[in-house]
Amino acid sequence: AQYNTNFVLKYIICDNLNQNSVKNLVIKARENARGSQDKITKELWEHINSLYHFMNDPELPKKLETYDALSIITKLNKELLLYNGILHVTMPRGLGWCFSSIGKHIERCLQTISLTQAYYNPIGYDLDGEEDLLYWRRLLLSLSGYELYLKSYSNIPHNRKVVQQVVFNREFAHSVIYTLELIDTYLDFLFKDNNLSEARTLQNQFGRLKSYIEFTDYHYLTNKELENLLKNTKEQLTQFSTDFSKLFFSYT
């Protein structure tokens, strides 16, 4: 079934049992938006609500089995890009924006690490290997970094250069270091008037995590060190996310 196009499309887009399906993520987003309507803009709420009704159309799973599938994916892509645009243009840069940005970049960082692991694990994290650009193209496209990679790096070998872009490149918006530095900026804003010892502990915890990446020299990284770097960063960031939620959100 995992090789069946219809199955995969429905699983990713509208499977009620898949916690990370687009449908379930939109439902959760709407619940969050409804609970904080006084903190978000009318435009943002209306867009999320519209997307919610689109995803809950009972005919959607059937349409994904027809030639309408491509137009549905195109519409979803457009609507999610619009959501990003509305969020950026209309949201005041207060605490709501701060929490939203921290959550977004934690998720982005974890996605980058997971996708990177998925491509390096099958080749034993071999940084001196000679996998061709076709192998790395899918990873780079998934992270919206293929074009930047082509412009920034010369030809082979790619294995170590891809790590440089997706983990250590401060100019790449989906890199691990870029997302960690943005989280750090928002944490500074969030904690600037907070004297709670728990807040200081949390900020120090994140500072150690960021320094771990910051002071690693990818030029001399070994295969095993890369494997451990990705694994440890993922574990530490997940733990930070849990601790952050416990401090600020009582339902966690």
Enumerate the predicted regions with their spans:
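Alpha-helical transmembrane segments and their helix-helix packing motifs
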Residues: 1-252
